Amino acid sequence: MNSLFDSVYKIMVDSFPMEEIRSYEGQKELLSREDYYIETYEQEGQLLGICAYYIFDDFLYIENLACKPSARGLGIGTKLVQAILKEANGRQVILEVEPPTDEITKRRIRFYERLGFTFNPYEHFQAPLNPTTGMVELKIMSSLGALTEEQQQAYRRVLNEKVYLVDPNFMI
């Protein structure tokens, strides 16, 4: 699994700003959690895409969706998200995106909207994932339609406590 994990982590590093991913050791620690999963997409023995997610009682949370740079635009991300939506079996799926400030972030939001997700405009901050980074302003997208502000706060409390490992009321 170590070689596969190294490949997964390389895709994460190549796809996300460092403040949006954990350290190598921090990411590897997640593999021992019962609520954390990584869905992979491989072709001819090559890892081309990953989707890291959590399964909680009432919802699933996609933390990372990424494809190898050479495999982007091939529909792999769509297949991975569709697999998670199937796994959710009618439960809410949420994920975080950067605010729509440029063409890349707007395109990413449109990608998720094509898969049925709704952009929620409420304020949301990702707590620091490692000691060398700060908070990151993000927005939540949801698979079962728009969230009320109260619903988003309830999801944020779970993310704060179980994903970011901070006080549930952090930034609420």
Task: Set out the residue ranges of the language-model regions.
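Conserved GNAT acetyl-CoA-binding A-motif
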Residues: 88-104, 109
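A short helix-loop-beta-strand connector motif used in the catalytic cores of GNAT acetyltransferases and
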Residues: 30-40, 134
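Short amphipathic alpha-helix that is part of the acyltransferase structural core
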Residues: 1-25, 42, 138-140, 150-172
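Short strand-loop junctions, especially beta-strand C-caps/beta-turns
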Residues: 65, 70, 96-100
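Conserved beta-strand in the GNAT
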Residues: 40, 46-54, 59-66
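Conserved catalytic-core motifs of GNAT/GCN5-like acyltransferases
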Residues: 96, 109, 113-133
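Conserved acetyl-CoA-binding loop-helix of GNAT-fold acetyltransferases
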Residues: 67, 73-87
